[in-house]
């Protein structure tokens, strides 16, 4: 399953929508996706979204789409 992670790079700053960044990771479940992010980054995670097949197809149309691996 592909998950879209919305995060802030600097955990000490207040989250602002204008500075929210996203990445995509592959995981078997939402808890595993959160665990992967927490173990490999210092990011302030705002939201983790499980993407449907249609959503993945839509996101792949973006030239910047890339599934991050750690």
Swiss-Prot record:
* Top enzyme category: transferase
Q: Which NCBIfam families match?
A: PRK13667.1
InterPro entries associated with the record: RpoY
The record's family statement is: Belongs to the RNA polymerase subunit epsilon family.
Q: Which UniProt keywords apply?
A: DNA-directed RNA polymerase, Nucleotidyltransferase, Transcription, Transferase
Q: What Gene Ontology terms describe what this protein does at the molecular function level?
A: DNA binding; DNA-directed RNA polymerase activity
EC number from the UniProt entry: 2.7.7.6
Q: Which gene encodes it?
A: rpoY
User: What are the annotated GO cellular component locations?
Assistant: DNA-directed RNA polymerase complex
* Protein name as catalogued: DNA-directed RNA polymerase subunit epsilon
Q: How does it assemble?
A: RNAP is composed of a core of 2 alpha, a beta and a beta' subunit. The core is associated with a delta subunit, and at least one of epsilon or omega. When a sigma factor is associated with the core the holoenzyme is formed, which can initiate transcription.
- Reactions performed catalytically: RNA(n) + a ribonucleoside 5'-triphosphate = RNA(n+1) + diphosphate
Q: An example of a Gene Ontology BP annotation on this entry?
A: DNA-templated transcription
Which superkingdom, per the lineage?
Answer: Bacteria
Instruction: Relate the protein's function as given in its record.
Output: A non-essential component of RNA polymerase (RNAP).
Q: What is the lineage of its organism?
A: Bacteria, Bacillati, Bacillota, Bacilli, Lactobacillales
């Amino acid at each position: 399953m592909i998950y879209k992670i919305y995060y802030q790079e600097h955990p000490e700053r207040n989250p602002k929508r204008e500075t929210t960044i996203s990445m995509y990771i592959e995981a078997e479940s939402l808890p595993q996706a959160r665990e992967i992010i927490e173990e490999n980054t210092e990011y302030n995670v705002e939201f983790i979204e499980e993407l449907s097949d249609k959503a993945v197809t839509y996101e792949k149309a973006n030239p910047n789409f890339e599934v991050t691996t750690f």
